[in-house]
């Protein structure tokens, strides 16, 4: 891992609108990529961050530092990273709600290093993540909005109340409206919770399309799936949108944006990607 500077939030992307992995960052397609990736991940940024969290030292600078190391690790096993539309992350004066599809564990690790250098941010996340041994302390340190995923009405209340509270403090929220991680995108299973939160808080929505299935879903343990060396990792942020009326038009735009980006990327990456 690169040297960590206490209290300094790293910003390697600077004012770039687009980032694409280049030869110095990108490793060759790896043999046994899952073994190489997970051993480096657990012994590197995860262990380091858990130790800091146990001591009460998991602040934003540490969170971003670990996040950026995960980006480096996925590049080293031969997965090129592209991030488009980064100018839209800081295009609003105040906080916003990022609404994204949820494909794998990878975006949970990578997004802090992309977004936090521009603005304070946290996640809506399921309760099981904050109760994990060791890593749960990391999640709790981020002051997330916690949902149980068993009672939709209670989850909506938690997101609206907790989200408005954080947004008033200037903290943006990342929302994954799908009920579970999946490589497929179905607008019928992409709920309106992000749009509802933005409307209630009076803040813009920033749509985010992502393709992170280079980190697959495991059969026995979902978080430890196959690592598909050579498969690109992609993010694209759209321009911020204010919510008007009931938000149906904005919800439709978000779904169309994500669906069209995924279709384009799959075509570029190959039929079976």
Predicted regions and their residues:
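Membrane-anchoring hydrophobic helices of lipid-metabolizing enzymes
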Residues: 1-95, 110
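Catalytic core of membrane glycerolipid acyltransferases/transacylases, capturing the structured
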Residues: 37-40, 45-52, 92-151
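Membrane-interfacial amphipathic helices and adjacent loop/beta segments
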Residues: 54-86, 119-161
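A cross-family acyltransferase "interaction/gating" segment
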Residues: 85, 135-136, 172, 183-249
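Residue-level preference for the first positions of well-ordered beta-strands
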Residues: 95-97, 170-176
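Hydrophobic/aromatic ligand-binding patch that stacks against planar heteroaromatic rings
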Residues: 114, 138, 165, 196-197
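Active-site metal-binding loops of divalent metal-dependent hydrolases
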Residues: 179
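C-terminal functional extensions of proteins
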Residues: 239-267
């Amino acid at each position: 891992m690169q040297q960590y500077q206490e209290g300094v939030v790293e910003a390697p992307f600077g004012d770039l609108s687009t980032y694409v992995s280049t030869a110095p960052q990108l490793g060759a397609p790896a043999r046994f990529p899952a073994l190489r990736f997970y051993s480096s991940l657990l012994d590197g940024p995860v262990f380091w961050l858990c130790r800091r969290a146990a001591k009460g030292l998991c602040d934003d600078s540490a969170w971003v530092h670990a996040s950026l190391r995960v980006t480096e690790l996925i590049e080293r096993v031969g997965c090129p990273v592209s991030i488009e539309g980064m100018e839209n992350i800081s295009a609003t004066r105040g906080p916003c709600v990022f609404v994204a599809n949820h494909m794998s564990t990878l975006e949970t690790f990578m997004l802090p290093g992309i977004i936090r250098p521009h603005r304070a941010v946290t996640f809506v996340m399921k309760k099981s993540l904050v109760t994990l041994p060791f890593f749960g302390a990391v999640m709790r340190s981020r002051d997330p909005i916690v949902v149980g995923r068993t009672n939709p009405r209670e989850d909506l209340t938690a997101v609206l109340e907790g989200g408005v509270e954080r947004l008033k403090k200037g903290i943006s929220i990342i929302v994954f409206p799908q009920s579970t991680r999946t490589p497929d995108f179905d607008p019928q299973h992409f709920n309106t919770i992000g749009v509802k939160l933005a409307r209630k808080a009076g803040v813009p929505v920033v749509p985010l399309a992502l393709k992170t299935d280079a980190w697959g879903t495991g059969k026995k343990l979902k978080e430890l799936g196959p690592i598909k060396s050579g498969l690109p990792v992609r993010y694209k942020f759209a321009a911020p949108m204010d919510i008007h009326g009931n938000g149906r038009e904005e919800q439709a735009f978000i779904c169309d944006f994500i669906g069209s980006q995924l279709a384009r990327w799959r075509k570029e990456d190959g039929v079976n990607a």
